[in-house]
Amino acid sequence: MARYIGPKCKLSRREGTDLFLKSGVTPFEKKCKSEQIPGVHGQRRQRLSDYGLQLREKQKVRRMYGVLEKQFRNYYKEAARLKGATGELLLQLLESRLDNVVYRMGFGSTRSEARQLVSHKAIAVNGRTVNVASYQVKPGDVVSVREKAKNQARIQNALGIAANRGDVAWIDVDSKKMEGTFKAVPERGDLSADINENLIVELYSK
């Protein structure tokens, strides 16, 4: 499946919530008419079946992290193989992706922009260039913007946006040095309460 490159608001409207696909400069409610689904004007949401709810939750999380269907299923399989709560482990695997960590550190204003920075070799992990967005960052890893990329306007803008958004507890960031430390894998309580990972587990357990 190809990566979606269409309007970001369309995806957020489809899921009925902010997927954080845009920079956050303008409030979500002003950017996207979230109460209306894409398509015919004025069309409202219908009551979903249990399967429909499970599918929508999976799509919401998959789109939020910018992961393709096959990749997402592989993350679920890996989470199911590990010891612990499968849904929580799934979210932790997604949060540990390098593109997500770059976004969390504020070097990219969106996960999509962070993914571009990684693929364009603007990011290093422990001093070594890594250009694989799905690279799993481990506790203690230091993620930094490479010297040649530090003057990019989009990174400077992203850091300004991140300052307003605030830092997350599991990451330390030195915005002046443009580097940060992934202190620990986040606990479930640290992550969005707007995600019901149990619905995803129910979907894939069928």
UniProtKB/Swiss-Prot annotation:
Relate the assembly described in the record. Part of the 30S ribosomal subunit. Contacts protein S5. The interaction surface between S4 and S5 is involved in control of translational fidelity.
The free-text function statement in the UniProt record for this protein reads: One of the primary rRNA binding proteins, it binds directly to 16S rRNA where it nucleates assembly of the body of the 30S subunit.
Q: Which GO terms describe its cellular component?
A: small ribosomal subunit
- Name the GO terms of the biological process aspect: ribosomal small subunit biogenesis; translation
Q: What is this protein called?
A: Small ribosomal subunit protein uS4
Tell me which domain of life the UniProt entry assigns to the organism this sequence originates from: Bacteria
Q: Which NCBIfam families match?
A: PRK05327.1, rpsD_bact
What PROSITE patterns would the database entry show?
Answer: RIBOSOMAL_S4, S4
GO MF term (any one): rRNA binding
